[in-house]
Amino acid sequence: MYKRPLLCIVLVIFMLACNLPSHAPNSNPRLLATLQASTPLAVFTAAPVPPVLPASTEPTGRIALTCQIFKEESKEQICIVNADGSGYRRLTTGDELRHYYASVAPDGQSVVYSAYNTQTEHFEIYELHLLTNETKMLTNHFGDLNAPEISPDGKTIVFTRYYLDVAKPTTWLMDRDGTNLRQVVDLVAWDPTWSPDGSAILFASDMKQTSQLFIVNVDGTDLRQVGDFPFLRGRSDWSSQNLIVTYSGIRWERELYSMNSDGSGQQRISPIGGNSQGPSFSPDGQWIAFTSYFDRYEVHGCEIYIMRVDGTDLRRLTDNEYCDYQPRWGP
């Protein structure tokens, strides 16, 4: 079994503490953190009013998410729900694993995710086929791997890799079957997502001291920063309409922001006061799913909400006694 330096472990926790509910009972300190919580604050800064967009149709498709089915033990599973809130069900069955970062394939037939094995103490990437529930482990001790996402053409998976002996997140690619692993760019980079045409990758990095978003071509060329945020966290998305959505803010003051893919037009879009985070666009680019605490401001209060891309028509999608978070929208 690998033994990791204490400093390495601490750095991994710091970099991955972007999205987990706080105060998870008896949680292993090396596990992913996804929705940090703290004391809500009452003072907020006004934001520009988003432009009014044409009304879209009702949301369609399905949203995969992390669900704390066993609240007290905090054993995270992967669940899925229809875009109208119906059909909520658990997908994963391995109670010895803790599951995170689900993402629906572009064809809607499968879900990829990262899972932590409490026995081997490693994160691996899996793919689960929705029709058969057949699950395949795609990686094997290549480091601690998370945030997998399938390319628009369905052939490639981008993901974050933490080396086993160095707490440095990097962005990698592999073929759909888990072979042909290669690094995109030799930089600190986490929470990657694809451009609509699959030619570029959006990711978060602190290469310039503060965490910001960057875009790079799949071949590692043309690296550039997009947007400028004071407290960027990580999990972002890039829509079919060429908009980028992300979240920024200190604990319990996080809000969603959208901008054009060149970084222009940056503005807050989430209703104030929900501690909103982890956004994901609908396939048509007209809606956003995200995690928030609008209705229950406490450690197990995070639920999945959706809204239109201009921040209107807020709807609560899940309603459970445990946390639902890390949504990713698919067809």
Describe these PLM feature segments.
Residues 2-3, 12, 18-331:
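Sequence signature of WD/YWTD-type beta-propeller architectures
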